[in-house]
Amino acid sequence: MKVKKKKKEDFKEFRNNEKSAYKTFKIPLKTILLNRDTTQPVINHLVFEMNDLVIHTYQFIRFYVLDKYTKIQPLPTIDETFILYCIKTLGTRDNRGKKGKDTELLETLEQFYKTEYQPLLNHEKTNLKNTTFLLPYLATQIHTSLHNNFQEHFIQHFLRFINKTTNQITEDKSILFQFKNKCLSLEETDIIFDDWKNIHLPNILPTEIKKSIHYDIKVRPFEYLKGMLYMNSVLEKQESKLFQPLPLRNNIIPKHIILDTASIINLFCPEKDKDGNKTKKGELLSNVKDNQNEIWCNFLDMKNKIFKNKHYQFHNQIQTDGISCCLLFIRKDLKDKKWGSRVPVLQEQDFHTIEDLSKEQLDTLKDRNIVGCDPGKHSLVYMMDKKGNKLEYTASQRKIESYGKRNQRILLQEKKKHKIIEKETRLSIQNSKSVNYDKFKVYLVEKDKLNKETTDFYKKEVWRKMKFRQYSYGKKSIDTFLNKIKETFGENILIGYGNWSRSSQMKYTMPTLNKGLRKLIHKKYDTITINEFYTSQKCCECRNPLKHYKDTKGVEIYRLFTCSNCVSCENKNIVFRTRDKNSAINILNLTESWIHNQTRPVEFQF
């Protein structure tokens, strides 16, 4: 079944200058917080409590689902309501307020908590007082995490499951490749796989799949929960490597929580004054919109320059981990939107290929300084123009400039000093990905024990400060690089940007910017996409194939090539080509060739 691609709009201009509806600014919390001595400890305590609550919520959901799966009972519908009920089950609150609609589910969860979860971990419920408006945000975040896990990883896990369970049927990769594609598109497959399909597919795929698995997993991802558990159970019996069917929060460094106006009122406005008289807390909560300006003026320094923005205004919501703070802003022309009404969604920036431009549009680019840009994993971008000016931005450079490497070293030293590594190593014996109910119980006990032993270490402010510092210096590193582009190549430039990209993370390498870096460059400079076909394999001068350079031991040198055709007849010197520089020059030449002649050299045609 062919998937219809969304038709790209005709090229009109390089970028969409329309402003997004929302914007966030990340700054240190202490720079805008009023009455720091009294308010920051309250926020810190809440951050710690909610982080612990979220950790247990992930574990409780997984434990409850495994219990149902093991007993061959219907799995729960994992929506925000179910997650919110799980959160409430793990906490205590008074009996005032609106009762839950599904009392049967609440009672079932409470019973499971009392009989299974609480005795296992000796868990103490979290005090949920003054968190009424915060809990739905936590439920949404957890739901999004679970939802994304299914959408992003089910296909990958399904294909790996096929690899691991079809060894006895065929080892022919081409036959297996066709079988995988036909399975995903729900087409008839080779009869040699009939027994395999009868055994496994009913346990993996839901009924009434629409169009294809690729489409259906996006529409109703939680229908594939049973399949994820089944595949993991089969792999576990085979003693193969497992995947995570339902994610857990294993990192216990406190994370950000969302605070809105109602949450601020609940936290900092007492119900009664010193004399025992009722305050206006109830009145404020019943009329939040009219009082929100007054509330935030008493909580944050609204005279701070961060709030003075020409196009945006503060939208009465923050995210904080007690150290850093993300302020939510809304466009001023949308500030009076009605509750529930939709705001205009800014379309994702289209990166047009050079073939999308008409001859008239190409003619306007002839006086530009063309820059060839080769994106990659280790060298994030390597740029070069026809004058020989070059600029490179590497993953290692970014890691050092953002203090990422320094932070890793400090964390490792402190973990060794406090013997945290020894404690965490003990947990590695257990498997958090197991779907065996008893094995997962053992893991939960060991993980909870470890969390209690290390929680004081990870609650230290230094880890959250380092995370914020890494974010800040990472932005500074990018800004410095963007300014260097102008210094190196001038203002009137057109960047021919190679179309290299990866859809998944490369093994044994750190995560790096790819499309995100392209977006940042494109915001400031005009870029056009160039097909990279053969640009790293053929010489930038003679266009003949390059060969890897080998040392005296016959070992290929990383990213270093030689061109036998460009060797001088007089001195027989070897001509070396570095992969990135060679690609950048080829991309530059392809860009210029299309602008002036609307043709692609024969050697680079596909």
Residue ranges of predicted features:
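Positively charged, helix-rich recognition surfaces that bind polyanionic ligands
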Residues: 2-59, 65-74, 78-606
